[in-house]
């Protein structure tokens, strides 16, 4: 199969992606503080709740609801990235911009330029467990782990650096993308009634202007 390579530069891709994000799903660089920021449940600090395992949120990714045989991860890469070539029905060669670093990412760096991709839980599973998910029924934990609102394709290096940290311990390396990140995290926390520490809440508010 002939691989379709992008004809635009990384800079052009970044500018185009930023414009699209401002107009559609990821208003990076043009957002204001989410209303969810005022609705956060705060606790003095994050305490470790014993018993966390990845399998408490399901054995891997859930199945796609629209493409039989594919996974939720496959769906997220398909919708959040630009498909360059249909090398595989579930996992095409795709490219995009990491919403944490602003750098080009690729689902297959050997075939299309960009850093390797991982799919990140914006509100990490381990952190969610500590902040209340330990008490959820399995069905709710499965839904949380596979909720598209909590999933984002990012550079592997950013995801590894973040690990299970919340904002008082980690923020995106690109400072212009931090408001978007904490807004997303606040929305998820409010939706799922997850608490954040006072330190996390303070850092989150600091990243976004009022309005």
Where do the PLM segments sit?
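N-terminal module-boundary/linker segments of secreted carbohydrate-active enzymes
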Residues: 2, 22-70, 198-202, 209-210
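C-terminal, well-folded lobe of enzymatic/effector domains
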Residues: 2-13, 17-23, 28-29, 162-211
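A near-ubiquitous, low-amplitude feature marking generic local secondary-structure context
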Residues: 13, 35, 134-138, 168
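Detector for methionine-enriched segments
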Residues: 1, 21, 37-39, 76, ...
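Betabetaalpha-Me/HNH-type nuclease active-site subdomain
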Residues: 45-154, 159-163
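Residues that form generic nucleotide/phosphate-binding pockets
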Residues: 39-43, 75-79, 128, 184, ...
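Alpha-helical interaction segments
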Residues: 41-43, 112, 171
């Amino acid at each position: 199969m002939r691989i379709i390579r992008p004809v635009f530069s990384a800079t052009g891709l970044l500018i185009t992606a930023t414009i699209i994000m401002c107009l559609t799903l990821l208003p990076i660089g043009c957002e204001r503080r989410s209303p969810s920021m005022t609705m956060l449940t705060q606790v003095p600090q994050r305490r470790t709740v014993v018993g966390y395992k990845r399998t408490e949120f399901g054995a891997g990714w859930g199945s796609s609801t629209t493409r039989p045989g594919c996974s939720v991860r496959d769906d997220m890469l398909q919708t959040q990235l630009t498909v360059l070539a249909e090398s595989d029905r579930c996992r095409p060669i795709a490219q995009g911009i990491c919403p944490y670093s602003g750098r080009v990412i690729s689902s297959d760096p050997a075939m299309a330029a960009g850093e390797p991709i991982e799919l990140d839980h914006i509100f990490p599973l381990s952190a969610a467990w500590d902040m209340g998910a330990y008490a959820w029924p399995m069905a709710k934990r499965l839904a949380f782990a596979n909720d598209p609102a909590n999933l984002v394709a990012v550079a592997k290096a950013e995801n590894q650096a973040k690990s299970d940290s919340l904002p008082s311990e980690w923020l995106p390396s690109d400072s212009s993308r931090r408001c978007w990140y904490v807004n997303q995290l606040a929305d998820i926390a409010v939706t799922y009634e997850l608490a954040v520490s006072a330190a996390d809440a303070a850092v989150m508010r600091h990243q976004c202007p009022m309005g």
